[in-house]
Swiss-Prot record:
Belongs to the CTP synthase family. It is an enzyme of class 6 (ligase). It catalyses: UTP + L-glutamine + ATP + H2O = CTP + L-glutamate + ADP + phosphate + 2 H(+); L-glutamine + H2O = L-glutamate + NH4(+); UTP + NH4(+) + ATP = CTP + ADP + phosphate + 2 H(+). L-glutamine binds at residues 54, 354, 382-385, 405, 462. One of its GO terms (biological process) is 'de novo' CTP biosynthetic process. This is CTP synthase. Homotetramer. It comes from the Bacteria.
Length: 546
């Protein structure tokens, strides 16, 4: 029978509930338990697909094409387990489902209310994860902060959930802040006490407290919080600030979090195998060299907008024993100044995805700089489209070449709308989304990096390379090294006369893992370090299914 864990947060937002949930998933998996992690987000958007990156950060795409919260990326990277649309629930999607049922007459004319109908739908979504994926443990992170009005239906639903499964099959974990007050010279537990009091007023008694702090808890504090918050002293867990999020599972293991959870859920205590994770963290913390990579993006004011990109670079750099130095450059700055001012001296350039015309000419300028100065370059999604625009304007001499997305009147639409997108009106959930196969050309750089003839990657786009320009593209020295299996859609392009120049229409950052760095990011880092790419060992990717 599946067990259930609920992770709530108190005192402040962005306290790290997602990392705690992902870390616990890793600790349970290291003991041989299968895990699925679910995120309940209290915003009314149906999904984050149409939200501004400045407000929400990255939209993480699952293998089955769901546009989800960036925390699902943490869940996948920490547990090596693919998530799906079942693992992402928002207030908007809950209300949409309930209203659709009401319109169909499913409630037989009854008055539809938050309790019981909304809370029942929330509980059903949690049960569905257990029923469809059959994990040993389902971990559910509740977004927001205890006390927020938006989170109340979710908190009420998880209170009711105890009645569904029984007390022995459920655990509540509350992540809270224990701040250091410089003027007093001590840490304060009062915010935690009040947060737990608020949670208990809703009817939820936490079993475990995970205390975020910037230093070790002072003597007697665990006992004090134990007494005031009605948890055992062993269940008061310290989660001290770490230099890397990948240290957190090891820290929580030392604190005994997994053992406490297994005791509460009456599951067998097993010996963890964290050897691989410890080796990865050791690599991360003990580099022998340095590599500097610049990310030229549209949303760099919020680095979380490119979270999976930066983490993928970190995975690849650590696997090469290198300390990654990231330089963030706003693409718009390159439109107004000399690219050399921003890009001189870097070892590699990444141009990631985005939407809309703003900053695109800056991305094109960065790619031209990489091409002219033989700097290793990797383009992702819009980054590939910008590479094609650079080719058209600056190599093929097609004046005014552009994407039809940015200039519908361009004389040379080298990037065009996918045929199936022609009549699409709605924005949310209507792009080419999720895992798609890609055929790799033999003898290409892509084939050397992947070591496969067919690969599967995740997509999120409406526009593609315009095949009317493919012959001219090939004649000018470029290579189409990856296509859809029917050869119609261009998925990867590269420039053979460059040390490392490759761009893809998909999002490889969504499948990179600490123990499985993505081949394209590994190749970029190796090239940036001056390594011989003929010696690249193809990196296996985790198997995925839809």
């Amino acid at each position: 029978m599946t067990k259930f864990i609920f992770v709530t947060g108190g005192v402040v937002s962005s306290i790290g509930k997602g990392i705690v949930a992902a870390s616990l998933g890793r600790l349970l998996k290291s003991r041989g338990y299968s895990v699925s992690i679910l995120k309940l987000d209290p915003y009314i958007n149906v999904d984050p697909g149409t939200m501004s990156p400045y407000q929400h950060g990255e939209v993480f795409v699952t293998a089955d094409g769901a546009e989800t919260d960036l925390d699902l990326g943490h869940y996948e990277r920490f547990t090596d387990t693919p998530m799906s649309r079942l693992n992402s629930v928002t207030t908007g999607s809950i209300y949409q489902a309930v209203i659709n049922k009401e319109r169909r007459g499913d409630y037989n004319g009854g008055t539809v209310q938050v309790i019981p109908h909304i809370t029942a739908e929330i509980r059903d979504r949690i049960h569905r994860v257990a029923q469809d994926t059959h994990p040993d443990v389902v971990i559910t992170e509740i977004g927001g902060t205890v006390g927020d009005i938006e989170s109340l239906p979710f908190l009420e639903a998880i209170r009711q959930f105890r009645k569904d499964v029984g007390r022995r099959d459920l655990a509540y974990i509350h992540v809270t802040l224990v701040p250091w007050i410089p003027s007093a010279g001590e840490m304060k537990t009062k915010p935690t006490q009040h947060s737990v009091k608020e949670l208990r007023s809703i009817g939820i008694q936490p079993d475990i407290l995970v205390c975020r702090c910037d230093r070790p808890l002072q003597a007697g504090m665990k006992e004090k919080m134990s007494e005031f918050c009605n948890v055992s002293p062993e269940a008061v867990i310290t989660s001290q600030d770490a230099s890397s999020i990948y240290e957190v599972p090891l820290m929580l293991e030392r604190e005994g979090l997994a053992e406490q959870v297994l005791d509460i859920l009456q599951l067998e205590q097993r010996q963890p195998d964290l050897t691989q994770w410890q080796r990865w963290v050791h690599q991360l913390q003990n580099p022998s060299r340095r590599v500097e990579v610049v990310i030229v993006g549209k949303y760099v004011r919020l680095n979380d907008a490119y979270l999976s990109v930066s983490e993928s670079l970190r995975h690849a750099a650590a696997s090469a024993d290198a300390d990654l130095q990231l330089r963030w450059v706003d693409a718009e700055d390159l439109e107004n100044g000399d690219p050399a001012t921003y890009l001189d001296g870097v070892d590699g350039i990444v141009v990631p995805g985005g939407f809309g015309a703003r900053g695109v000419d800056g991305k094109v300028a960065a790619i031209q700089f990489a091409r002219d100065h033989q700097i290793p370059f990797l383009g992702l999604c819009l980054g590939m489209q910008a590479a094609v625009i650079d080719w058209a304007r600056n190599v093929a001499g097609l004046d005014g070449a552009n994407s039809a997305e940015f200039d519908p009147e361009t004389p040379h639409p080298v990037i065009a709308l996918l045929p199936e997108q022609q009549d699409v009106v709605d924005l949310g959930g209507t792009m080419r989304l999720g895992l798609c196969p890609c055929k790799i050309q033999s003898g290409s750089l892509a084939q050397r990096l992947y070591g496969e003839d067919i690969i599967y990657e995740r997509h999120r786009h409406r526009y593609e390379f315009n095949n009317a320009y493919r012959s001219l593209f090939l004649e000018s020295g470029y290579c189409v090294s990856g296509t859809s299996p029917d050869s119609h859609l261009v998925e990867i392009v590269e420039r053979p006369d460059h040390p490392f120049f490759i761009a893809c229409q998909f999002h490889p950052e969504f499948v990179s893992r600490p123990n499985h760095p993505h081949p394209l990011f590994q190749g970029l880092i190796k090239a940036a370090l001056g390594s011989d790419l003929t010696l690249v060992d193809p990196a296996p990717l985790p198997a995925e299914t839809v």
